[in-house]
């Protein structure tokens, strides 16, 4: 009024500030931390599962690679056996031929190594020859073989009782009654052996004994025991007859053995004339044994082949995986090199 200036009224909006109690703020912080912990746990679990899946795939891949390498070694041996027949001729087999040379361990591109060897099964004692009409004669031979290796002769009785069809204990052997008392209990096979690794099942047999006799024993799917004089070990040759001395057998092995016929062998080694009908210079049965390692995976494959003496055709009779592999060398591979 009059000379006074009149001020315009204005409104001030009220600002509402809410203060949480200390307890509520603590609960909120714990909730956040709990959520973070759950997320971390889930992430860790997912990462762990992922690593497990990757590891499983890696192991599966390495195992498959090892298997393929083993098959490759098997096929190479088959081809070598066929080439030996078709190129060198069917008349003779000896240890200087290509098939008899072991594939020494060598490194693989995928990391690891491969080793392979071919064993002539006509150059060793066929344990299945303990069955049949000549079983007792062959048992006596097996005992002489064990004697030459300083192994208990009673183990021969154990092997005979394992493969024969009866339950009559032979000498120091054992039938079902001895095995059923073991833990776990089991029975004798009472049938021909399928693989020489069955020796590990024999009652009270020691690993040292198996290591000593294994190079001289083999399994052929028949009771035949035809001996290839060009590939047989000294102990096996010595076992053939009491008239054969260990010195004579050792002399044969230490000579260059590539006899073309039994007649020339007998002329050079007359002590063997008594067993001439059981001797030969060719082989029909072979075992190819390969061991492969790829990464952390190891594969052992034993393959039994029969080679037809008329056509040279090589037939796969059976495969056995994870069998005992007796290497011919000691290998020390530096993974970083």
How does the language model describe each region?
Residues 1-25:
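N-terminal leader/signal peptides at the extreme start of proteins
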Residues 2, 27-337:
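Compositionally biased linear targeting/interaction segments
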